Amino acid sequence: MNAPTKDQSLRNLQKGGELCGKVKVPGDKSISHRALLFGAIAKGKTLIEGLLPAEDPLSTAECLRSMGVKISPIKKGDIIEIEGVGLNGLQEPQDILNCGNSGTTMRLIMGLLAGQKDHHFILTGDKSLRNRPMKRVGQPLKMMGAKVFGRCGGNLAPLSIIGNKLRGAVIGTPVASAQIKSAILLAALNAEGSTTVIEPARSRDHSERMLKAFGANLEVGGEMGRHITVSPGKDLKGQSIIVPGDISSAAFWLIAGSIIPGSELVVENVGLNPTRTGILDVLEEMEANINVINKRDVAGEPVGDIEVFYKENLKPFKIDGEIMPRLVDEIPILSVGACFCNGISQIKGASELRVKETDRLAVMARQLKRMGASVDEHQDGLTIYGGKSLEGCELDSEDDHRIAMSLAIASIMANSNSTLRRSEAAAISYPDFWSDLKRLQQKN
């Protein structure tokens, strides 16, 4: 099953076979980035257990090392040790900081560097990242006094940042984005006076939880916690962090277990932060057979195991802008799930997906149509007509990790075998995806 051909990026995908067993998804990508960044600017030692050893967090770690932060080698199963340098201890790097494919790395580091006075930094990334919008972060940072420059009026990398004296501000973000919010909060740690971020809707709150744990003077208020205020002056102190499993990675197994006949899965150690559990709400709307068990609290984050069993006659669903911040990364695999619902599913308010690693709305529509699905693409979403069988064919992840894994699940439900180009993209967030899929798949 799933053996790569001589071209390692081209993978053969076999149809059929239920998925059965237990799977532990890798550490949460969002939390992994933040643990590295906050540990770097804390005083003292930070220990991280369960850090995601995938390409995106590795990019963050390498950028921090280039600025003088000592981080132990990142290997699966190892506890990672960081020697923090304090809020103003980052060194001016001798070379360009390469963020790879990671938008989170670039955007959060922009906030981190904005207040490193008189230091000069240049950030770049791969072709995909160099075409993703950065002014949405640079503009609010400029309101605090940051000096940020880049291509296309500061919107595209490479970016040049000259550390400057920052001042606190009240900043309303145009979209509910944890990346924008977190960049501002990082900059606020080095500003004169308090900074308040006001979001149009609540986004994932890992930064707030973790900054509090590190000792930052941070308050959350306003309707639904949309106002976040940081007052500078307190040093961060190194912590011991345990990273739970990533619910965005778990989503592939939750949908697969729901749509593939005969499947029975337990996804273990999944982070259940309420700002991330929109996927569970949609599965409930689909009337999928899932149960959350062994609920517990780990290092300030709710965690549990999720059982999922195949169920016939899944209901179609509707997703709008209100829930979107809680499941934005799960839209590709939910699009696959919609193909096997009895009726028409609608996804709206998802225009943010057009500026991810790829234009995920266009790519999912294109690839699912190639398989014979009935999909209408709109400016801010998709309409998917369920109940139509899928055909095996030549598929392409277009270098997007979430697309690669979503198409892998879709291919199991096709009526003939498929191939997937650029399958290695899965390693961006889930290095063991293909081996886990092979282990879980039971051939008839």
UniProtKB/Swiss-Prot annotation:
A GO molecular-function annotation: 3-phosphoshikimate 1-carboxyvinyltransferase activity
One Gene Ontology term, aspect cellular component: cytoplasm
Residues reported to bind phosphoenolpyruvate: K29, G103, R132, Q179, R360, R402
Matching InterPro entries: Enolpyruvate_Tfrase_dom (IPR001986), Enolpyruvate_Tfrase_sf (IPR036968), EPSP_synthase (IPR006264), EPSP_synthase_CS (IPR023193), RNA3'P_cycl/enolpyr_Trfase_a/b (IPR013792)
Keywords noted in UniProt: Amino-acid biosynthesis, Aromatic amino acid biosynthesis, Cytoplasm, Transferase
Pathway info: Metabolic intermediate biosynthesis; chorismate biosynthesis; chorismate from D-erythrose 4-phosphate and phosphoenolpyruvate: step 6/7
Binding site for 3-phosphoshikimate: K29, S30, R34, S177, Q179, D329, K356
Segments crossing the lipid bilayer: none
Subcellular location: Cytoplasm
EC number: 2.5.1.19
The reaction(s) this protein catalyses: 3-phosphoshikimate + phosphoenolpyruvate = 5-O-(1-carboxyvinyl)-3-phosphoshikimate + phosphate
Catalytic residues (UniProt): D329
Any Pfam family the entry gives: EPSP_synthase
Gene3D superfamilies noted in UniProt: Enolpyruvate transferase domain
One GO process term, biological-process aspect: chorismate biosynthetic process
Assembly notes: Monomer.
Purpose: Catalyzes the transfer of the enolpyruvyl moiety of phosphoenolpyruvate (PEP) to the 5-hydroxyl of shikimate-3-phosphate (S3P) to produce enolpyruvyl shikimate-3-phosphate and inorganic phosphate.
Family: Belongs to the EPSP synthase family.
The protein, known as: 3-phosphoshikimate 1-carboxyvinyltransferase
Organism of this sequence: Prochlorococcus marinus (strain NATL2A)
